[in-house]
């Protein structure tokens, strides 16, 4: 049975899911004896789940999910960690596999899977704290020596979002790097940048809005705005339009000037929210570029 090939029979599906679950089990056992290896499992689990979701029929995925969760619990005897780390990774891996099958652009795949992974992790925090009788977030921050950080409460959601981004990003990177070898077609065609510009402006608006009453989510949406901005910046760099380069340079100088003047006038940690002007400027330039120049590209 070819490892990276669509499965056609029930036996193939069960065998394939068993192989992937066994690979997960190996990492689980290693992580049990060497706890730092748990992070390798956390990073690789979405990839294994994505491969299963892509090559197997979706109705059989629940078998793989239940088997993986069960093995994690039986080997670690920690239902809290299993719910907090493993379940979101399995769910986001399934979504990534479906999006791959639908030939969605990697940008949207990464964003969708990250949001789902992070949202499930957020949602499970109260349940995990209740089951384990410990503060799972504080335990996670302690691993990175951030337990005494002054603004740790404001950074918790952003921290989880970035971990989810790393998880899903690694899975997508591996898939894109070996796409031809494993028989997966990646869609990199972009016919319009307007959805990206709209997404950027929406994330900026949400970041500014939440900053008024709930800073943790404001920082998450600030991070999302930088995600959109980084993608649009690549397009601006490859536009090879002198007017765009000049406009970008002028805006960069203006942003640095504005940031330097107003940053200290804002109370910590709200000063960081002022960095929203960076993605905002990129959005403005991208907006003008897409009005003046229209062409489909591959990114």
Where would I find each of the regions flagged by the language model?
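Alpha-helical transmembrane segments
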Residues: 13-26, 65-70, 195-207
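Short helix-perturbing small/polar motifs within transmembrane alpha-helices
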Residues: 18-21, 87-126, 265
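Long, positively charged, glycine-interspersed low-complexity recognition regions
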Residues: 23, 227-299
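Central hydrophobic cores of alpha-helical transmembrane segments
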Residues: 62-72, 108-118, 243-255
């Amino acid at each position: 049975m070819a490892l990276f090939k669509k499965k056609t029979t029930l036996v193939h599906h069960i065998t394939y899911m068993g192989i992937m679950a066994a690979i997960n089990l190996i990492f689980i056992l290693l992580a049990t004896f060497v706890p730092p290896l748990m992070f390798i499992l956390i990073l690789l689990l979405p990839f294994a789940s994505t491969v299963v979701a892509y090559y197997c029929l979706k109705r059989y995925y629940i078998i793989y999910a239940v088997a993986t969760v069960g093995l994690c619990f039986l080997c670690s005897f920690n239902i809290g960690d299993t719910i907090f780390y493993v379940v979101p990774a399995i769910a986001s891996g399934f979504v990534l596999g479906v999006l791959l099958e639908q030939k969605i652009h990697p940008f949207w795949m990464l964003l969708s899977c990250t949001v789902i992974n992070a949202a499930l992790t957020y949602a499970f925090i109260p349940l995990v704290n209740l089951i384990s009788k410990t503060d799972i977030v504080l335990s996670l921050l302690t691993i990175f020596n951030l337990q005494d950080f002054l603004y740790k409460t404001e950074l918790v959601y952003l921290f989880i979002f970035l971990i989810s981004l790393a998880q899903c990003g690694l899975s997508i990177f591996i898939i894109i790097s070996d796409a031809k070898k494993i028989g997966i077609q990646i869609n990199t065609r972009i016919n319009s940048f307007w959805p990206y510009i709209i997404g950027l402006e929406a994330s900026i608006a949400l970041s500014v809005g939440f900053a008024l009453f709930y800073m943790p989510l404001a920082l998450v949406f600030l991070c999302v705005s930088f995600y959109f901005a980084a993608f649009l910046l690549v397009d601006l760099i490859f536009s090879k339009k002198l007017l765009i380069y000049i406009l970008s340079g002028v805006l960069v100088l203006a942003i640095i000037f504005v940031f330097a003047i107003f940053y200290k006038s804002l109370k910590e940690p709200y000063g960081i929210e002022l960095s929203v002007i960076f993605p905002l400027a990129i959005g403005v330039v991208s907006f003008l570029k897409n009005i003046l120049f229209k062409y489909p590209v591959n990114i």
